[in-house]
Regions:
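Short acidic/glycine-enriched loop/turn segments that link adjacent beta-strands
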Residues: 41-43, 66, 131-135
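Conserved beta-strand in the GNAT
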Residues: 48, 54-62, 67-74
Length: 144
C-alpha cells in the first residue's frame, strides 16, 4: 500500500479534492452545495492524500495575514480511523513550519472532532457557532 500526500499540483488533483469534499460534505453530511462550493478554491492551496493512487482525503488552506486556516478537511468514510486525518493535519503543520509561511494554523472544527484536533496540539478558542447547520468551534495551533 503506497500512501502519498501532497499540495495539489494540477487540475486533476484539485478535481479529486473537490470530489472528495462533495462525497463527504454534500452527500454524507447534507451540507448545501451553495455553502460547500464557496468560490474560494482558486485562491487557496489544496492538500490531497492518496492510497495506491486512489484519492481518500483532502483539505484546503486559506492564507490570512498572520495565520493559515485549514478548511474542508475530509476523509472518505471507508478510510476513517486509520490515521489519515492525522496524516493530513501533520503534513500541513510541517509544511507551514518548513516554509515559514505563518505563525499559527487555525481551523473551525466540527464539535464532534474537537478531541481529534486536541490530540494533534490544537487549542480551542471562542464560542461555538453554526456553519452549514453544523456546530463548530475555532481552534489554533501555534508554530514553535
Amino acid at each position: 500500500m503506497v500512501t502519498d500526500i501532497r499540495i495539489t499540483q494540477d487540475k486533476n488533483d484539485l478535481l479529486s479534492c473537490l470530489q472528495l469534499r462533495r462525497t463527504v460534505f454534500i452527500e454524507e453530511q447534507n451540507v448545501p452545495e451553495y455553502e460547500e462550493v464557496d468560490g474560494d478554491d482558486p485562491n487557496c492551496e489544496h492538500v490531497l492524500l492518496t492510497i495506491d493512487e486512489t484519492p481518500v482525503g483532502a483539505a484546503r488552506l486559506k492564507y490570512y495575514d498572520n495565520f493559515i486556516k485549514v478548511q474542508r478537511v475530509c476523509v472518505l468514510e471507508g478510510y476513517r480511523g486509520q490515521g489519515i486525518g492525522s496524516n493530513i493535519i501533520n503534513f500541513i503543520i510541517n509544511y507551514v513550519k518548513e516554509n515559514g509561511i505563518r505563525q499559527s494554523v487555525r481551523l473551525g472544527s466540527q464539535t464532534h472532532a474537537l478531541e481529534f484536533y486536541k490530540r494533534l496540539g490544537f487549542i480551542e478558542f471562542g464560542d461555538e457557532y453554526l456553519d452549514a447547520g453544523i456546530l463548530h468551534k475555532d481552534m489554533a495551533y501555534q508554530i514553535k
